[in-house]
């Protein structure tokens, strides 16, 4: 179990074999759409992976892919063709993953980003709509995501171009040979620039937290005793936001405990040495045989 590095910082047990990082389901549908993702325990047992489609054998990056709820990835075209070859009266349990034989259709009560994307993709083909008891489409839409992405890009490009043209039309027309006194302009603008620059400065300089360099990248690295000692020493003597009297009382208490331990050790050693010397003294009052 680990922590995903996305802004949501969710705890997850899934691990990306290609990038070797913990990933949550939000990252699977956004940043790791074609990566091999399984549990971290599975990666510890066998870290080898194949970045090709199990159905056709070609690389996953060549075509559009889909991830099932078991996290196995296939080419959408290959998976669609395989499921279309099944009889029309196939039960929902008959549509299974070609790798692990888990059901393709996510349960109704399953709420996850991977399941939502899979439901959207399955709702665009007739064989899945037939199983889900939905009205059939006139024709399947295998290139829905590609078309939607392209149209969105064209729309954004047109919007950006129109906004740029409107901005340019609102600009003041300049003469071809205008002269600007840069010295006076800089001198007049420098107070405002200094004010804005100073406003961005933090009131209190915040230092990096202790152990900031020791993050998720090397949290599984085996540390030497020297590194452990240096880390705890920096934690003790580094400036912190806690009240100073806590640090003082901590040092005083630690010194008292150390002094008591030293006295106890010296007393124990002295008692042992004294017992040995007393045993060598000859007592004349005791009866003894001549």
From Swiss-Prot:
Protein topology in the membrane: Single-pass membrane protein
Compositionally skewed regions (Polar residues) per UniProt: 156-168
Keywords: Membrane, Metal-binding, Transmembrane, Transmembrane helix, Zinc, Zinc-finger
Cellular component GO terms held in the UniProt record: Golgi apparatus; membrane
Residues annotated as transmembrane: 249-269
Zn-finger region bounds: RING-type: 53-101
Annotated stretches, region: Disordered: 156-175
Membership in a protein family: Belongs to the ZFPL1 family.
Stated name of the protein: Zinc finger protein-like 1 homolog
Organism: Aedes aegypti
């Amino acid at each position: 179990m680990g922590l995903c590095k996305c802004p949501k910082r969710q705890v997850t047990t899934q691990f990306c074999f290609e990038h070797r990082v913990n990933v949550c389901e939000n990252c699977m549908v956004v940043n790791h759409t074609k990566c091999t993702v399984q549990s971290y325990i599975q990666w510890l047992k066998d870290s080898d992976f194949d970045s090709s489609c199990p159905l056709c054998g070609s690389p996953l990056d060549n075509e559009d892919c889909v991830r099932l709820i078991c996290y196995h990835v296939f080419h959408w075209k290959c998976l669609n063709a395989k499921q279309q070859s099944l009889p029309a009266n196939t039960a929902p349990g008959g549509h299974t993953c070609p790798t692990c034989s888990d059901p393709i259709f996510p349960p109704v009560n399953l709420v996850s980003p991977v399941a939502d994307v899979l439901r959207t993709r399955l709702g665009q083909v007739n064989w899945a709509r037939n199983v889900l008891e939905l009205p059939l489409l006139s024709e399947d839409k295998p290139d829905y995501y590609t078309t939607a992405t392209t149209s969105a890009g064209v729309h954004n490009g047109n919007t950006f171009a129109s906004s740029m043209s409107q901005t340019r039309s609102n600009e003041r027309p300049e003469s071809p040979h205008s002269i600007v006194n840069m010295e006076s302009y800089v001198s007049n603008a420098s107070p405002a620039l200094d004010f804005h620059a100073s406003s961005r400065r933090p009131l209190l300089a915040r230092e990096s937290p202790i152990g900031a360099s020791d993050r998720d990248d090397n949290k599984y690295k085996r540390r030497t005793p020297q590194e452990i000692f240096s880390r705890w020493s920096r934690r003790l003597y580094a400036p912190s936001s806690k009240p100073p009297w806590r640090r003082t009382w901590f040092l005083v208490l630690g010194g008292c405990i150390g002094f008591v331990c030293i006295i106890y050790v010296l007393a124990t050693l002295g008692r042992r040495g004294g017992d040995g010397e007393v045993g060598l003294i000859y007592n004349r009052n005791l009866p003894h045989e001549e």
